[in-house]
């Protein structure tokens, strides 16, 4: 079995269907003895350029290990599913389990914004307590 990295973009109107789609694809992979090494839901993001007058899409990244027959079945599923706008399959030499740079940058942004929110909350609470003391 070979290792693959798959990214697919789902139409923004179908974002609610993403968990069911991912579950269907992971079942397809694991039923044949394959493995899902990494699965990341990047959420709805801006596209670099419009595709069929669509400016945003829901991104999903999967790193899998599967047979050629499962991969061709996945490609057919992507091709005939109208909800999937684009997909990319890349063969990898080994399994990738690290957090992707996009997901890591989201984590850093969350960590940066959390202290700022806490500072704002503390500042606001100080103002409120000062007002109540008067």
Swiss-Prot record:
UniProt keyword rRNA-binding present: yes
Pfam families, per database record: Ribosomal_S6
PROSITE patterns given in the database record: RIBOSOMAL_S6
Residue ranges with Basic and acidic residues bias: 105-125
Biological processes per GO annotation: translation
The keyword Ribonucleoprotein is assigned to this record: yes
InterPro entries per UniProt: Ribosomal_bS6, Ribosomal_bS6_CS, Ribosomal_bS6_sf, Ribosomal_S6_plastid/chlpt, Transl_elong_EF1B/ribsomal_bS6
Family per similarity comment: Belongs to the bacterial ribosomal protein bS6 family.
Protein name, as recorded: Small ribosomal subunit protein bS6
UniProt source species: Marinomonas sp. (strain MWYL1)
Lineage of the organism: Bacteria, Pseudomonadati, Pseudomonadota, Gammaproteobacteria, Oceanospirillales
Encoding gene per record: rpsF
């Amino acid at each position: 079995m070979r290792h693959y990295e798959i990214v697919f973009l789902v139409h923004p109107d179908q974002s609610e269907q993403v968990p069911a789609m991912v579950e269907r694809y992971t079942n397809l992979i694991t039923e044949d003895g394959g493995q899902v090494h990494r699965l990341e839901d990047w959420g709805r993001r801006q596209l670099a350029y419009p595709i069929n007058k669509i400016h945003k899409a829901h991104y999903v990244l999967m790193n899998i290990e599967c047979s050629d027959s499962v991969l061709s079945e996945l490609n057919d599923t992507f091709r005939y599913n109208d909800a999937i706008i684009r997909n990319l399959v890349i063969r990898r030499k080994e399994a990738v389990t690290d957090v992707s740079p996009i997901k890591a940058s989201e984590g850093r942004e969350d960590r940066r914004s959390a202290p700022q929110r806490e500072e704002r909350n503390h500042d606001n609470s100080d103002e409120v307590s000062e007002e109540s003391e008067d």
